[in-house]
């Protein structure tokens, strides 16, 4: 067993050993998050086939650091209930993708999962909350906390490591669309919701 695989060692010791074994290309590959997850598979019923685009990216980078948007399903992703990953198949899809990455990484490094979560889990069957501006207008942090916890459970069950959300607070009305990313453009709801 390599030192980086030994759970008895400290994270620092394991990371130092792993980084010492990695090539520059593998290190760059771990920083890579350019591949759209919804483009790496084709679904037929309950079966998934990985695309050549995905396989070539894993080969070229010596692994894959972060995969963005595997569960995303909307018109932009061109995925729906028949072609996308429904909740019942999410673990199966994740395991197929993760196994491929580990098996095709010289050092067996797993990937991290990243997804959009501006106001809930953007996936088929994912729970959504009101956009942040509307959530701020509830003036009810406990209710929102319950909703955020439910979203967190969904993300965790999908093995999502990084949920991308909007947390900026804008005051200028000229920002238009961007103001919906914050809990409010006013200080009181921002203070209430932290």
What feature does the model see in each segment?
Residues 1-194:
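Glycoside hydrolase catalytic-domain context in secreted enzymes
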């Amino acid at each position: 067993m390599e030192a980086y695989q030994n759970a008895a060692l400290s994270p620092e010791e394991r990371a130092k050993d792993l980084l010492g074994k990695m090539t520059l290309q593998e290190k760059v590959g771990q920083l890579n998050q350019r591949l759209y997850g919804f483009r790496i598979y084709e679904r037929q019923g309950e079966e998934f086939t990985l695309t050549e685009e995905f396989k070539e990216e894993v080969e070229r980078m010596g692994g894959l650091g972060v995969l963005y948007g595997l569960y995303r399903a909307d018109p932009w992703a061109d995925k729906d209930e028949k072609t996308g990953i429904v909740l019942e198949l999410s673990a199966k899809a994740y395991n197929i993708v993760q196994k491929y990455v580990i098996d095709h990484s010289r050092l067996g490094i797993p990937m991290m999962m990243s997804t959009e979560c501006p106001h809930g889990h953007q996936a088929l069957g994912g729970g959504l909350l009101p956009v942040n501006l509307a959530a701020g207008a509830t003036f009810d942090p406990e209710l929102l906390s319950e909703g955020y916890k439910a979203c967190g459970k969904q993300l965790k069950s999908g093995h999502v490591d990084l949920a991308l959300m909007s947390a900026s607070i804008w005051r200028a009305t000229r920002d238009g669309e961007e103001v919906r990313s914050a809990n409010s453009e006013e200080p009181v709801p921002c203070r209430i919701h932290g």
